[in-house]
């Protein structure tokens, strides 16, 4: 006789084990019709799963924008599998999980799927969903599940059972009419909930993400509760495609990638200009917040990486080389090198906090399938910093780091920032006392600045709690960039100590701090955020001067030289082309200011100024324009509207 407690505190008693759907039906037919699944004592369950003991229950409906939508998307992945097996009976099904904003299914199929094939598959999915057939869940023994998929010729499902499912477990088999899939669930009770979806694209993916395994075909899709939300998402995807940093990078001559150096960036002059301006900006912040800038070696002996613990955890992601019977690893991160710098010379508590920053050139052997333009690379520059401090200094230093993060992001126009605090995991180093003190210090730092945050219980690293900063761009995409991570482990492993007030040797706390993360990735984010319309201070070309006839050529060149001497990235366009043609061309290149000179301007010692978005700013004396643009550059104004 389970007693079910609902979110409003009311209780309902049942004579027999009861399902979420039956509870919903007891409340009303409208709720039952909208019910997708349940959350029993905080755990998601299928609407048909029986509740045998007293429990709290939340009914998940179509209006649930988090769990409800994820369940719909997961069920759409099964629907995709259903359609695929009808159209391609020879296909071998691998996995079909949800991802941010959608789902995918990995399949083993000899023929390569095209966009036309995706349209055919989507059409079949819609035909199936239109029937609103019921999804039937059956819990079976491990052996029965294995026999089921072996008889159906599904080797990937069999492998999952053999390697990932306990023999004592009872896997859930979901019957979609003649199609059967295996999943933890939950899933929708019927396909009437899966009406608003589309397939997006197909790509290659190694089975289990291992390049030693077979390359499968991964079909991506997305789904929403209603047609309006789906349409809005597809519009965002279209806008994202227009803003693709790879496309704009080529258009603006910023960088390129090539097969001979996978995951390594070839920076062109225009792109390197942006990179250097970012470095200058970060250096200004480092000076403002009292950091020392250092530079560590690109590679170090394997012995050091073994002592730091990185060899055990990151060896597969590290590039190595050897010389004179010694093995070296190219650094994937800067922290062990910074500890070596700290260790040079005796340190006192009076020397702390010591803030050490580096534009570290790091390399990680990312899988080739994961590489993506300059967003996911193998060679990158990290705006890394490490703060060595005492336990009593943690809160003050963390607060300073948080201020620096917000100062930086606001300069680029990122105001929507989600903050997450990850607390101690079960397996960890350090005393409970230091964890208590550190977690409280992180909380106090955030609360003192009135910053809302989410707590991720048990998600901290084994060596310390951390704060993560995720910024959202103009398309509402999340980018996790900033991190403030406490470390009670590495300094001790690498022998870092300082002399305390009582002349005892103590191990400092280390704070790992990144703001932009990888400069390459952050530039990619900026390209897509601004669609190539960089603020003037970042723009590779800040002004272009154009003559109307050859008569003004000399005057234009004089002005260009004057602008350049004033620190403005300016150039002349003296081509024998119509002025409208030249303006259009430089507009496409996103040059912030186009300066036009005709006879009238030359005689008056002026220039006609217009922005790349077509706004006419009128005529300026040359010195007045220099003062105008210098103010915009030095103050790092966004000026995105112009």
Curated annotation (Swiss-Prot):
Main EC class the enzyme belongs to: ligase
GO molecular function: ATP binding; metal ion binding; threonine-tRNA ligase activity; tRNA binding
Binding site for Zn(2+): 335, 386, 512
Region ranges (Catalytic): 244-535
Subunit-level organization: Homodimer.
Biological role: Catalyzes the attachment of threonine to tRNA(Thr) in a two-step reaction: L-threonine is first activated by ATP to form Thr-AMP and then transferred to the acceptor end of tRNA(Thr). Also edits incorrectly charged L-seryl-tRNA(Thr).
Protein name: Threonine--tRNA ligase
Native organism: Vibrio parahaemolyticus serotype O3:K6 (strain RIMD 2210633)
Gene responsible for this protein: thrS
């Amino acid at each position: 006789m389970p007693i079910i407690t609902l979110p409003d505190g009311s209780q309902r008693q049942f004579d027999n084990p009861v399902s979420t759907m039956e509870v919903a039906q007891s409340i009303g037919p409208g709720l039952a019709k909208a019910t997708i699944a349940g959350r029993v004592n905080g755990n998601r369950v299928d609407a048909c799963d029986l509740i045998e003991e007293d429990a709290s229950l939340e009914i998940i409906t179509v209006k649930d924008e988090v769990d409800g939508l994820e369940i719909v998307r997961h069920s759409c992945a099964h629907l995709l599998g259903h359609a695929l097996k009808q159209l391609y009976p020879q296909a071998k099904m691998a996995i079909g999980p949800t991802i941010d904003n959608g789902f995918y299914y990995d399949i083993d199929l000899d023929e390569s799927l095209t966009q036309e094939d995706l349209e055919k598959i989507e059409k079949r999915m819609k035909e199936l969903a239109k029937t609103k057939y019921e999804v039937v869940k059956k819990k079976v023994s491990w052996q029965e599940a294995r026999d089921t998929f072996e008889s159906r010729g599904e080797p990937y499902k069999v492998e999952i059972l053999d390697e990932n499912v306990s023999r004592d477990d009872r896997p859930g088999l979901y019957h979609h009419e003649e199609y059967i899939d295996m999943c933890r669930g939950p899933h929708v009770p019927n396909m009437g909930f899966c009406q608003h979806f589309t397939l997006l694209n197909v790509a290659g993916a190694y089975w289990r993400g291992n390049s030693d395994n077979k390359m499968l075909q991964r079909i991506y899709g997305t789904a929403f509760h209603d047609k309006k939300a789906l349409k809005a998402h597809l519009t965002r995807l279209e806008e994202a495609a227009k803003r693709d940093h790879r496309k704009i990078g080529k258009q603006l001559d910023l960088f390129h990638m090539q097969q001979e150096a996978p995951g390594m960036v070839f920076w062109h002059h225009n792109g390197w200009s942006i990179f250097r301006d970012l470095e200058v900006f970060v250096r200004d912040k480092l000076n403002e917040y009292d950091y020392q800038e250092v530079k560590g070696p690109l590679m170090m002996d394997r012995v050091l990486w073994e002592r730091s613990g990185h060899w055990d955890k990151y060896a597969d992601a590290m590039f190595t080389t050897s010389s004179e019977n010694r093995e070296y690893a190219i650094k994937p991160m800067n922290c062990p090198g910074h500890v070596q710098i700290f260790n040079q010379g005796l340190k006192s508590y009076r020397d702390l906090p010591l803030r050490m920053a580096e534009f570290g050139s790091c390399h990680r052997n990312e899988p080739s399938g994961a590489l993506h333009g300059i967003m996911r690379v193998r060679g990158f520059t990290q705006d890394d910093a490490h703060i060595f401090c005492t336990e009593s200094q943690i809160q003050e230093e963390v607060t300073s780091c948080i201020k620096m993060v917000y100062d930086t992001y606001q300069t680029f126009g990122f105001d929507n920032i989600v903050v997450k605090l990850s607390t101690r995991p079960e397996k960890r180093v350090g005393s409970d006392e230091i964890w208590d003190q550190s977690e409280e210090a992180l909380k106090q730092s955030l609360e003192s600045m009135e910053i809302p945050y989410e707590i991720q219980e048990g998600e901290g690293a084994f060596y310390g709690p951390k704060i993560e900063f995720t910024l959202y761009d103009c398309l509402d995409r999340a980018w996790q960039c900033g991190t403030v991570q406490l470390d009670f482990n590495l300094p001790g492993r690498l022998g870092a100590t300082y002399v305390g007030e009582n002349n005892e040797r103590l191990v400092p706390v280390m704070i790992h701090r990144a703001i932009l993360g990888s400069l390459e990735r952050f530039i990619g984010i900026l390209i897509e955020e601004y669609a190539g319309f960089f603020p003037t201070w970042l723009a590779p070309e800040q002004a272009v001067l154009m003559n109307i006839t050859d008569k003004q050529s000399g005057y234009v060149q004089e002005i260009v030289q004057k602008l350049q001497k004033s620190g403005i990235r300016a150039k002349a366009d003296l081509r024998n082309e119509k002025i409208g043609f030249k303006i259009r061309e430089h507009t496409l290149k996103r040059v912030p200011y186009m300066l036009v000179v005709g006879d009238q301007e030359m005689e008056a010692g002026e220039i006609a100024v217009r922005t790349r978005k077509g706004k006419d700013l009128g005529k300026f004396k040359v010195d007045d324009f220099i003062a105008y643009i210098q103010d915009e550059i030095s103050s790092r104004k966004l000026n995105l509207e112009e």
